[in-house]
Amino acid sequence: MSDDEYGDIDEDVWDVAEALTQASQTLPSNSPHRRKRRRISSDQELDDYNDDGLSIQQRRRSRGSASSDHDEGDEKRQSKYRIHLGAEEVPAAVIMGATQADGMPDSSPYRIRGPIYKRPRPLPSPELEPKSTQALASVFRPTKAQKQNIVPQPAPAAAYDFSKELEDLPSDAFSPSPPQQGMSTGLITINSSPPFESTQSIISQRLVAPQNGLRQTTLFGGRAPNQAPSSTQAKKVHNYLVDKVPEPPTHHSLDREAIKTWVYPNNLGPERRYQYTIVHKGLFNNLLVALPTGLGKTFIAATIMLNFFRWTKNSQIVFMAPTKPLVSQQVKACFEIAGIPRSSTTMLTGDQTPALRAEEWDEKRVFFMTPQTVENDLKTGIADPKRIALLVVDEAHRATGKYAYTKVVEFLRRFNKSFRVLALTATPGSTVEAVQEVIDNLEIAEVEIRTEESIDIKEYVHRRDITEILIDPSDEIIMVRDLFSKALQPLVNLLCSQKAYYNKDPMSLTQFGMLTARKTWMASGAGKSANMGVKGMMNALFTVLTSMGHAIKILNFHGIGPFFSNIKDFRAEVEGNKKGGKYKNQVVNDPDFKKMMDRIQSWINKEEFIGHPKLTHLCDTVLNHFLDAGAGLTGDNMPPSSTRVIVFTEYRDSAEDIARVLNKHGPMIKASVFVGQSDSKRSEGMNQEKQLETIRKFKAGGINVIVATSIGEEGLDIGEVDLIVCYDSSSSPIRMLQRMGRTGRKRAGKIVLLLMRGKEEDSYKKSKDNYEQMQRMISSGSRFTFRHDLSARIIPRDVKPEVEKRFIEIPPENTQDPSLPEPKRRAKARKKPAKKFHMPDGVETGFRNASKLNGNVAGPPSRIFGIKRKPNELNDDELAPIPLLDSVLLSGRDMAELDRRFLRVPDGALEEVEMPDLTAQTITQRSLTMTAKVSHGKYTRKCVDLFSKLSRSQASEDRDIKPYGDEAPSDLGKMPTMPLEAELARIPKAPKPTQVSKLPQVTKTTSAPKKTPASRKAIPKKAPTRRNRPLQHENSDSEDSTASMAMVSNLRSSQIPQPTPDSEEEGPGERVDRTSDMEDLEASDDSDLGSLVDFIDPTQIQTQMTLTGTSSFSSSPPQMERWDGDERQKRRGRGGLLGRAVERDKAKNLSSQRSIPTMTQESSDDDLPTIEDLVRGDTTTKKTVDFPSSSVLSSGKKATPNMFTRKRDGDVRGRGAKRRIVDSDDSDE
């Protein structure tokens, strides 16, 4: 036997392990009492078991081979699911299979396979150590979970305790030995799961679900510390690929070639990975970038602006910064880094007029502006919100409340759904709520935040040494505090007596504390139930002590000088009786207050007096810094110092006091204040021009120390600043980080904090801890809700731009002119443009009727509200496109269609086109019908209006005789006929008239006038109205024909005999002229339209005339026919138009035989059709019928139907005997 077959285990240990290979064995009992050790079988049975054809060594050799005896059918039938078996059905061999190998040959499931080991070498067996024995026993001891879930099967013999058999085994009894022939080298995993047969390698596979019931041990065999048990259910995490929300296409015009790539400039040297990542994410998401100062936020903004400038054709890009110095700083970055052309760039502030800004919005594409200017231009309509594609917001932590940043984004969202937002800041906010408000107001979808400890920016962050100097108050400050405290003590005691304030130390007063106490007292029961006198007293106390709290803060943190200036203003107000009061006078007149003011006045008069110990440490720090930098060397050829210092303070009075003290150490120190634009009571503000001039001198070396207020905390990029001195501390982490970020941009910097021991020291620690906590929260993103729904991609989803890293060529125009791209004022100032109202897409404009407010009306807004769009004006200079020749020539098929439909007519059809019948569709003529392409003209509308008004103006009995009537008379068969032959024989010829009488003029009145017979007195001529006369006569030369017609009518009416009252025969009556008709309609609104006579020019109608082919006027009246009963029945039977046509034919034949013209006068156009031919379409000869005159109607006689029949057949043709033509400009179809 070779050495490889031996292990490190003693032979006696192997003999003990052989006892475990019994054929039938059950699990240990769950009984709490220990059972006795007892043999289950004799030695002979054990020997038989060893000799049954499968020895122990053979089984040991066969562990390395896989179970090759399984047929393929068993493998196919094996399911991936297992059936759970109860504890009583699980054999001991399966439960204890953790010590067995999977590759054993088939055997009884109740047989326990031998342990994995190697035979020990023949050496003296060492003594077993108790620790190893206990460790090995712990491996085989069943766990608590197994004891609870396993119930032993009943057996004839008592259960055997296996753990006692293995107590003497060492800890490395089952460690693997060098591989033997036929034995696997794979590792065996001990677990609580039952072994499964597999044809694969015996190397254990890791399961996804966590395993239960395991006990972890250390490398030396000891038990690992207990941990919380894992859940029985495996925690599965599914990474589903959710489809993105469909996004409507952008309305911006994109360059399809440019959007295939995005440019990353290499002008500034090697690439920074964090900048590349932020730029790539900012191109497709609304991004909030939070980077420490000096890490290239300006470069990131310029790169994104460059790509949007390339991608869009005419869209606009807006960069907003709170101050003009920050705006000008970004302008230079875009010119020198991104290479955006200067001709497309402008910088607009409130200094430019609205008219000048309107020109820039029409011509430029890139704008650098303050947020207030952008807001005003959007509200007035100067800027088009739909054209803005990118909005860059610098110092984004200001976007809270009602600041202009918030209003601009809100205004853009109303009109524009597709624009990108890039927000830049160093400190997003000091609280979770503030950061969430910034995210909501700017519609942020992603956040890229880095701290100074981030791995990818550590190599670019310069070292900053922060030094904290704790200062105690001076003796002068302590003396002033004591005197001031005594002066305020009575007021504080009075306030505490009302239980409104509980701290009786006046030096602990603060503005915030007083405001909070006042609000609390007013809301309490004592404040609500107090009378007006008490409320007035409390309000006065709170007001005085609040102002005193501000003065105490200045005294403690800024010095005696600023404190004296504040108190002096307070005293001046009281002594000048401007805002005097009981309690203010009490403070001013207090002896301790007067003593304090006198002492301060004597100190300030001394030049060497320094009002606060901070000033002493400040001067020492600044002087040492310049001496270390070599600035103290003097000489003619010495260059100016390259180091710079910035001192930050909160108040303007303190800044002026600091600059005064520092300038005493000149010329080494040249200090200047840097404040805002507003003026205070004691100092003048700095406009933007002065601010830019101060920064320019600071960079050039003319000024080496700037004493700045909060205006200098944000955004100033002055790379040579090596020392920052914080004269006062702030509890806001935003302000502290902004101050510290002014140094360490291009080289290592130093920060010195001057802190008063106590409250100011605590404020700084608070801000520092708050900053670190907020950075961790923002980085995790678990506490914030981002607006992914409002972040549009703008670029189509099918387009994936690829990066193009290249050197950007700067246009020559960007370097030739170093000035800012501010628009210059024109010689002639333009007027302020009118306000424009931009409408969102799909908005409803106009007014909606109340009947359509239910929202059920579908269609475009123009159809809902009846909006008439103005047609686009055609450009006269623009040439019409010339079509192709084949598109305008007729093809063979078109020629066949032309010949079939238009050149040939079917057999039997008339080849002549008749005149249109104006009485065919009278109802349709009174209203406008629908049109498809060509709308109705103005003359068509006038004619339709005329026809409808004429129809409304007629009485019900007159509609039948008018040319525009629709209904036939219902009593046509009852009308008698006059014997025309007899009447013509009796009536003599009428003498020639010597004087023509004119018709009376119709006068418009508001009430119906009295009807009078026609007068023969001449009246003035009525001037024709061309506007209301679309129908004109061909030869209208005069207006005398109207009088001639009236004369003829009167002569005929005088010659016709009138029937007696008893006679059944009706006389012809008088002619119904238009005067009586118009008199009936004068009271109506439409009476001013006149009648058809007004539209007919009667100048060509003579007193007596004879028309060829028609009836003529005669001096003798026609004979009237008498109708008998049979004839009346026949006429009634024929009825309507048919009977009228038959009667007309008879009258025509009789008139042609009897009528003798008395006067012949032919005009040059007698061959033309008459008005009746145009109206009725009948050019045949018609019977002359007299009409009843106006005298008959005016005399009170009843008009008979026969009168109107004659009127329709005769007088219409007499009055309109000439042809009328239609004016050429009245035709619109």
From Swiss-Prot:
Acidic residues bias spans: 1078-1088
Cited Pfam families: Helicase_C, ResIII
EC code: 3.6.4.12
Swiss-Prot/TrEMBL keywords: ATP-binding, DNA damage, DNA repair, DNA-binding, Helicase, Hydrolase, Nucleotide-binding, Nucleus
Record region (Disordered): 20-85, 811-855, 952-1229
GO biological process, one term: double-strand break repair via synthesis-dependent strand annealing
Keyword DNA damage (UniProt): yes
Binding site for ATP: L291, P292, T293, G294, L295, G296, K297, T298
Gene Ontology cellular-component terms listed: nucleus
Disulfide partners: none
Domain Helicase ATP-binding: 278-446
Gene Ontology molecular functions: 3'-5' DNA helicase activity; ATP binding; ATP hydrolysis activity; four-way junction DNA binding; four-way junction helicase activity
UniProt feature, compositional bias: Basic residues: 825-837, 1018-1030
Location relative to the cell: Nucleus
Placement of sequence motif DEAH box: 394-397
Compositionally skewed regions (Polar residues) per UniProt: 21-31, 1099-1118, 1149-1162
Helicase C-terminal domain location: 614-790
Skewed-composition ranges (Basic and acidic residues): 68-78, 955-965, 1068-1077, 1173-1185
Main location: nucleus
Catalysis performed (reactions): ATP + H2O = ADP + phosphate + H(+)
Signal peptide start-end: none
Organism domain of life: Eukaryota
Subunit structure: Interacts with the MHF histone-fold complex to form the FANCM-MHF complex.
Family as reported in the entry's similarity comment: Belongs to the DEAD box helicase family. DEAH subfamily. FANCM sub-subfamily.
PANTHER family in alphabetical order: FANCONI ANEMIA GROUP M FANCM FAMILY MEMBER (PTHR14025), FANCONI ANEMIA GROUP M PROTEIN (PTHR14025:SF20)
This protein's name: ATP-dependent DNA helicase MPH1
Gene behind the chain: mph1
